[in-house]
C-alpha cells in the first residue's frame, strides 16, 4: 500500500530565523542599525523571525517593520532603549520641498538618527518625521523633501523624537514578542502618539 501522507499541498512556508546579538548571532551589533539590517534582510526573503538575543540595544531611530515579520526577544533580557534626546531650534526658515534644515547646534544628531520637525502655527502643531542623511556644520540633510513649512515665527524645532518600533503604510502580519521597550523618559520628551 502506498504512503499518501507526503501527498499534501505545500502551502505553509517555513520561516527563516535570523539571530541578532551584541556579540553573537547571524548579525552582530547593539543598536537600531543591526536590527534594521535584519528586518530588511528578512523582508527580501518574504518575512521571517528576527530573533534578538539578550542585550541592551541603543535606538537612535525607529525599527521600521515589514510585512510577515516576527520580532522576538529573550524576555526581560532583551531591551530596546531609546538614546538620549535632543531638541534644538531651527535658525533658518525651511519650506516645502526643501531637504535640509539649519539648526542652532547639530550636536546630539547623527547620520541615520530619527528626527521630528515641529512648528506651532495658528492652525496647530505641524509635524514632519524623517531620518538624518548628512550633517555639514549646522546644516542637517533629511532623507526626503519636506511636505510642510517649518518657519521660525512658528517656533520650528528639530528633535530626536521617534517611536522605538513603527509599522507604516502597507505593513501587516507583524508580531512583537518578549521584548522590553524603554523610551528612556528621563532623557527624552514624550512623543505625541498621533505622530508616532
Predicted regions and their residues:
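Beta-propeller domains
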Residues: 193-196
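Extracellular "leader-to-stem" segments immediately downstream of a signal peptide or signal-anchor
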Residues: 1-190
